[in-house]
């Protein structure tokens, strides 16, 4: 039976100011817009919260409990006591959902989540790769200064549901591969405390992927010894670096449990070595017979390391790197900081040479270069850094993971929703169509 949902209007009052212990809800009722979805798809849970006197509980922060565990971002109730929570559901089978404010808990609703098949183009000559962070945990990268709030909330990279949901999103967009960022692990002996957390998150990712019928392949990007490399005068390798490379090879790449998950190129596993930022001049010469090695810099439009075969983390103007007269690698991004090495990094995003998202214009224009170059490896910058100085605000950012569109009065910035998810899915599909049409 449907209940009539009454509302109140409080002119000129921010309803977030009303969220006090005395006004916490005593009753929460929910309903869902769907009872059956495919894995990774969204439902909307509509909730209404009332105080003990029966009036709407305005400004109360609600969050979901799915199969007994917290899931997703918090949503505030409106002056009517209503909130609409958008929830992706990654786990197959029956998902039992309740909503709580930490005091009262709603009735439950059940949504059945079914398997899906994704039409991912498998073209080893034109791979599309998302730059991906798995660093969100208690001792590595924390939350609190993100430029926008992910739909999944302030999640942990150690939560298998998060890893699975990200993988399902990558599948839906059409990605072949994710690039895992291991560039910050060697400021002390390997494995450092943060390195151990990175290992735990990577263990989980490989385990989750191994259990999925469709998933992206994996590619590592590592950094230099002591997290320091400026030019050929600095040593890139050392005992910590070598220990980490051995660990990656033995634990993941050469592990029979994870057969066929890792990317190979020119007959060997591909390993990316980050040059610790934008640099000029040639890269170091690192030799390891186990790997095909490529180096990654940034801002090639100014540094021009592509002439030495260096790939890019991102560019203001996408600049392809060639190998044997063919475009080998290119990176496109939806936003970029300025390329001024004379300034502190926290000023890069507010420099007049920086480029914001601009409602997708930056991203779409960079994709045009990819359409023309058609590289062997097309990198997309990026999914989810969410920390300063790498991101500045909602526009001056290059994160793409779906984020909340917040209501007026919510102190959290209103993000970009699924805009860059949708653009990416459409551009990848168009990219493969164009390649196929010219064969």
Give names to the regions the model predicted.
Residues 77-85:
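Glycine-centered loop-to-beta-strand initiation motif
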Residues 87-93:
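Surface-exposed, short loops/turns at beta-strand junctions within beta-sandwich domains
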Residues 43, 93-97:
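Exposed beta-strand face motif in extracellular beta-rich ectodomains
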Residues 104-115:
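Edge beta-strands of extracellular beta-sandwich domains
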Residues 41-53:
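Beta-strand-rich structural segments
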Residues 55-64:
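Short, ordered, surface-exposed loop/turn motifs in non-cytosolic proteins
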Residues 35-41:
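Short, solvent-exposed loop/linker segments at the N-terminal edge
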Residues 114-439:
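Glycan-processing catalytic domains of CAZymes
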């Amino acid at each position: 039976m449907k209940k009539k949902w009454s509302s109140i209007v409080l002119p000129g009052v921010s309803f977030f100011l009303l969220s006090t212990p005395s006004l916490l809800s005593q009753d929460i009722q929910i309903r869902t817009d769907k009872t059956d979805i495919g894995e990774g798809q969204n439902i909307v849970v509509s909730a209404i919260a009332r105080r003990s006197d029966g009036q709407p509980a305005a400004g109360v922060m609600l969050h979901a409990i799915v199969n007994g565990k917290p899931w997703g971002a918090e949503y505030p109730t409106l002056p009517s006591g209503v909130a609409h929570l958008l929830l992706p559901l990654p786990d197959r089978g029956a998902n039992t959902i309740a909503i709580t404010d930490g005091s009262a808990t709603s009735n439950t609703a059940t949504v059945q989540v079914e398997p899906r098949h994704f039409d991912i183009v498998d073209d080893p000559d034109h791979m599309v790769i998302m730059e991906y962070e798995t660093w969100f945990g208690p001792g590595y990268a924390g939350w609190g200064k993100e430029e926008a709030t992910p739909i999944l909330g302030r999640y942990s990279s150690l939560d298998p549901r998060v890893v699975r949901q990200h993988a399902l999103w990558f599948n839906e967009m059409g990605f072949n591969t994710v690039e895992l960022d291991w560039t910050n692990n060697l400021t002390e002996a390997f494995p450092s405390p943060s390195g151990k957390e990175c290992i735990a998150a990577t263990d989980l990712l490989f385990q989750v992927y191994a259990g999925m019928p469709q998933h992206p392949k994996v590619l590592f990007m590592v950094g230099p010894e002591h997290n320091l490399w400026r030019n050929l005068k600095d040593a890139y390798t050392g005992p910590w670096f070598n220990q980490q490379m051995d660990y990656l090879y033995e634990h993941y790449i050469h592990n029979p449990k994870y057969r066929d998950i890792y990317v190979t190129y020119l007959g060997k596993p591909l390993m990316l070595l980050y040059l610790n930022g934008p640099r000029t001049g040639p890269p170091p010469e690192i030799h390891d017979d186990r790997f095909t090695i490529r180096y990654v810099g940034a801002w090639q439009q100014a540094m021009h390391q592509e002439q030495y075969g260096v790939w890019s983390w991102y560019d203001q103007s996408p600049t392809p790197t060639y190998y044997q007269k063919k475009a080998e690698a290119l990176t496109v991004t939806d936003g970029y900081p300025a390329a001024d090495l004379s300034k502190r990094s926290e000023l890069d995003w507010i420099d007049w040479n920086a480029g914001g998202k601009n409602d997708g214009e930056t991203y779409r224009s960079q994709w045009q270069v990819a359409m023309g170059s058609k590289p062997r490896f097309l990198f997309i910058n990026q999914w989810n850094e969410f920390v300063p100085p790498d991101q500045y605000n909602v526009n001056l950012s290059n994160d793409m993971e779906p984020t909340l569109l917040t209501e007026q009065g919510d102190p959290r910035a209103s993000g970009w929703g699924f805009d860059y998810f949708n653009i990416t899915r459409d551009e990848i599909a168009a990219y493969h169509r164009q390649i196929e049409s010219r064969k």
